[in-house]
Curated annotation (Swiss-Prot):
Entry protein name: 3-isopropylmalate dehydrogenase
SUPFAM superfamilies: Isocitrate/Isopropylmalate dehydrogenase-like (SSF53659)
GO cellular component: cytosol
Entry-linked InterPro entries: IsoCit/isopropylmalate_DH_CS, IsoPropMal-DH-like_dom, Isopropylmalate_DH
PANTHER family in UniProt: 3-ISOPROPYLMALATE DEHYDROGENASE (PTHR42979:SF1)
Enzymatic reactions: (2R,3S)-3-isopropylmalate + NAD(+) = 4-methyl-2-oxopentanoate + CO2 + NADH
The organism's taxonomic lineage, starting at the top: Bacteria, Thermotogati, Deinococcota, Deinococci, Deinococcales
The enzyme's E.C. designation: 1.1.1.85
Amino acid sequence: MPKVVTLPGDGIGPEVTAAAAEVLREVAPDVHIEEHAIGGAAYEQFGDPFPQRTRDALGDADAVLLGTVGGAQNSPWNSLPRPLRPESGLLALRRALGCYANLRPVRVLPGLEHLSPLKPELARGVDILIVRELLGGIYFDGDRKIEGDTAYNTMRYTTPEVERVARVAFWAAEQRRGRVTSVDKANVLEVSELWRRDVQALRDREYRNVHLNHEYVDSVAMLIVANPSRYDVILTENLFGDILSDLAAVIPGSLGLMPSASLGDGPGLFEPIHGSAPDIAGQGIANPAAAIMSVAMLLRHGLERPQVANQVERAVALALREHPTRDLGGQADTRTFTHAVLDAMGSPSVG
């Protein structure tokens, strides 16, 4: 029996995770779902944002479904020592799972083009997957320092680090439209020269059926807004991926529509990208679409059930058209939207 660990977390996390878990139970009744604490909620209960009992539960998990972590800006959690803050629990979780590749789909669903800040003709049909390296680069290198009026950080990658995340991108492209755009700054950065060399060599050895091109990060930052439909899979390192994925996140028009997956050698981590929204927590009005679409990614990448994942995505798209949530200009609350997704699963256009 497959095991999925749910970590509802803080703010609206428990509400959207409950909605997502309800959908998961409906479409995969054989899955054992086990709930554990993380973030501020875990600190309040156990004095640790990533308690040992949560860590232990991951050992035999097939996938992890995360809600949201953190509180308001004036939350007393922000006055805690940094290792005890909710966000430290999230970082510890990612380290424990060894997640080295983040997958961020950017899709404009049919009938929802009006939500995008782009013109409808630019937004229509956008379907991008950004694959970002998560554990290396300038964010994690230990060679860093502030000394008087001088500071430095080091961007460093090795061939094995580049190849393992590139394999994820090429594999994803094989399931999609067969095109990968590798993003770097090889005209000025030696680390990008290595990145470009290793990505190209891997493609030439193992993925000759995938079309690969290389583009500079500044060019992609412009073109992903001016002509987003030109991209299929975007592969990039940690810093560039952090910026590009947040830039692309505005294209669908709401963070409430954005799921994500983080993959590594262990169970994958699946989560909506939106924050904990403490201002609306407990009111039952949070949009659970991103959490439910994270379940679709979990089914596809964590449990290898792509057909069921496709059904969930189609059901969410139908529910969004017929029962939009309040953040999208509609009236549906969390419960109403979740039921709409479950009802849509029985629609001929979904099944």
